[in-house]
Amino acid sequence: MISAKMVKDLREKTGAGMMDCKKALTECDGDLEKAVEVLREKGLAAAAKKSGRVAAEGIVSTYISEDMKNGSIVEFNCETDFVSVNELFVELANNLSKQAAFSNVSTAEELLEEKYIADESKLVKDVITELIAKLGENMNLRRIAKLSVDKGVIKSYIHGGGRIGVLVKLACEKEDAKLAEIAKDVAMQVAATNPLFLNRDGVDTDTLEKEKEIYRVQALNEGKPEKVVEKMVMGRINKYYKENCLVEQLWVKNGDYTITKYLQEQSKEIGADITVEAFVRYEKGEGIEKKEEDFAEEVQRQMNQGK
């Protein structure tokens, strides 16, 4: 006979529904471990069905080592904002960012094949699949990035509960406690303004030529004479640099300073040059096309699947 305690134990072990647990235990003559396997098999089958659904919600998670010399950032997606704040989902996202920081891999695909940092008996991809079965939504480790520095600091900033995450690499020959605060200021700038490039050197030729052509056509359409068009184009390109290159942007906390000027002032105080060497900015779901479905159609679809 299947007792309430047996059902409770199986629910705690698997997170499956009460009736599913009871059916599995009945099927396995009360053998708890076999029932776990049965539910996993059913859960994995359900997870496979869910894998085709769009996962555009989720969170961005970062991890910084205690010495602030290494950092990582990951985007972990799910289908709804409800699951994105689920304790188990957030815990897994945070563990994935920590694992990425200490791993030798450089892509999400490679990380999925590693042993899971919190339970080395499982691969990362299997842990994700288990959570898909448990929470009933498709999930996807979309991307990861890492930064490290010998002299300087790595700092992160998370905005909006994981909607935006930023990783910043600040280089400085002198170790100073204030570097962390400066790096956070820069990370907040990146979160707020979403710069496309670190500096002018990072702007590729194709992008630059495309912008020049757009500005050239705009100037000609405004009826400007040919001789002044090039001057106008260069003026607008300089404006483009100031808007899209991090070090040339006006600092959001004090519009009298550019980021370069702010770092120069801080360099004087510390007594050593401070430079931003790299940054990574992730915004959850950016670039993912989310299918909008009619609620009534969605309910009908689920009813049809249940037949």
From Swiss-Prot:
**The organism's place on the tree of life at top rank:** Bacteria
Name of the encoding gene: tsf
Q: What does this protein do?
A: Associates with the EF-Tu.GDP complex and induces the exchange of GDP to GTP. It remains bound to the aminoacyl-tRNA.EF-Tu.GTP complex up to the GTP hydrolysis stage on the ribosome.
Where, subcellularly, is it found? Cytoplasm
TM stretches of this protein: none
User: Which residue ranges are recorded for the region named Involved in Mg(2+) ion dislocation from EF-Tu?
Assistant: 80-83
Q: Which PANTHER family match?
A: ELONGATION FACTOR TS, ELONGATION FACTOR TS, MITOCHONDRIAL
PROSITE patterns membership: EF_TS_1 (PS01126)
GO MF annotations, alphabetized:
translation elongation factor activity
Question: What's any one GO cellular component for it?
Answer: cytoplasm
| Assigned protein family | Belongs to the EF-Ts family.
User: Keywords, A to Z?
Assistant: Cytoplasm, Elongation factor, Protein biosynthesis
Q: What is this protein called?
A: Elongation factor Ts
A Pfam entry, by short name: EF_TS
What InterPro entries does this protein's entry cite?
Answer: EF-Ts_dimer_sf, Transl_elong_EFTs/EF1B, Transl_elong_EFTs/EF1B_dimer, Transl_elong_Ts_CS, UBA-like_sf
